Amino acid sequence: MRASISKSSIKGEVFAPPSKSYTHRAITLAALSKESIIHRPLLSADTLATIRASEMFGAAVRREKENLIIQGSNGKPGIPDDVIDAANSGTTLRFMTAIAGLTDGITVLTGDSSLRTRPNGPLLEVLNRLGAKACSTRGNERAPIVVKGGIKGSEVEISGSISSQFISALLIACPLAENSTTLSIIGKLKSRPYVDVTIEMLGLAGVKIHTDDNNGTKFIIPGKQKYDLKQYTVPGDFSSASYLLAAAAMLEGSEITVKNLFPSKQGDKVIIDTLKQMGADITWDMEAGIVTVRGGRKLKAITFDAGSTPDLVPTVAVLASVAEGTSRIENAEHVRYKETDRLHALATELPKMGVSLKEEMDSLTITGGTLEGAEVHGWDDHRIVMSLAIAGMVAGNTIVDTTESVSISYPDFFKDMRNLGAKVKEIPEE
């Protein structure tokens, strides 16, 4: 699908979609518990992949209105009777690869063409040290992956520089190992807030994780624990909401209220402080979970450290494109290992809209100006598509392709934007 986008302003109220990160974790932990109810989960392509994978490990999942009722494996995941297809979901692939190490048999996991390009080497290496046997069928650390269960627990190290999903996956699996595990992070832990979300969720499920140093990069994980996630309500997603907030800040005459944005461990809530730093008219009523943005103010250039919040890079890049001065997005090499190489995708597409941009291995330098309408490629990446779409609302006369990819994290993105008054028309492929 393609979208034709004209100059717009947006007004009204909208609910932030449920958090993808929290939904993935809630489903996964519920599937390892006995019986759980998850209220208001995000049902998107990625989270549906986690549901399907959980069912293959023995969980029973049913939907009742806005809830998921999950009968879990009670800490004993079964052997899947077919290949687990994680589709486009890196979280699903990494979490389920670790859980496969708990079974009494062999599990095969794969994904779509994009997911099969993403690295998994550090996770496979640690699983082997923990007593499982894990390998890539192609010998290149990419899916398809084969795992023979046998995690027993040990003292292991893992790099934190590629993906925090590896660490979260191990934190989820190792509490069910026979023995305790000590997991030490080598180097700087990228995307730390996602690990904090995992530990928060594990605590709600009754699982204990201890940190053994001041930096929080050494985790002591007792074995033979029990999962017991009874009920959980999924919070709103700041990453998905960032496109709504940024659009309103950039578009003159706009004023929107985004609900269901309460304080949480999500690192992406920094989008609110980022917009304030850039000079946007934005307020956050934390107690009510309501963020209000009014457009019209000229935005100022900033330096943005993407180390903890890689998913905000496309949003911030578009904001920088209209800001006065030169902005720098740095500490961002790990953004290259997402659904696409997002730094390269942004460096390719934004100049088509008149943006002056310099790409380096771990950074983007962007000089703000006037966005121009163009036909741009969405790279079949939900975050690239949504960021280019809001750029198109500023520029007008813009066409973005591969718009169906928004189903990964925010299926109602274009619907919500149209309801707020954005001039967006979806064009079926011929």
Curated annotation (Swiss-Prot):
Keywords: Amino-acid biosynthesis, Aromatic amino acid biosynthesis, Cytoplasm, Transferase. InterPro entries: Enolpyruvate_Tfrase_dom, Enolpyruvate_Tfrase_sf, EPSP_synthase, EPSP_synthase_CS, RNA3'P_cycl/enolpyr_Trfase_a/b. GO terms for cellular component: cytoplasm. It catalyses: 3-phosphoshikimate + phosphoenolpyruvate = 5-O-(1-carboxyvinyl)-3-phosphoshikimate + phosphate. Its main location: cytoplasm. The gene is aroA. Its EC number is 2.5.1.19. Pathway: Metabolic intermediate biosynthesis; chorismate biosynthesis. Monomer. Belongs to the EPSP synthase family. 3-phosphoshikimate binds at residues 20-21, 25, 163-165, 191, 311, 338. It comes from the Archaea. GO terms for biological process: amino acid biosynthetic process; aromatic amino acid family biosynthetic process; chorismate biosynthetic process. The keyword Amino-acid biosynthesis applies. This is 3-phosphoshikimate 1-carboxyvinyltransferase. The active site is at residue 311. Catalyzes the transfer of the enolpyruvyl moiety of phosphoenolpyruvate (PEP) to the 5-hydroxyl of shikimate-3-phosphate (S3P) to produce enolpyruvyl shikimate-3-phosphate and inorganic phosphate.
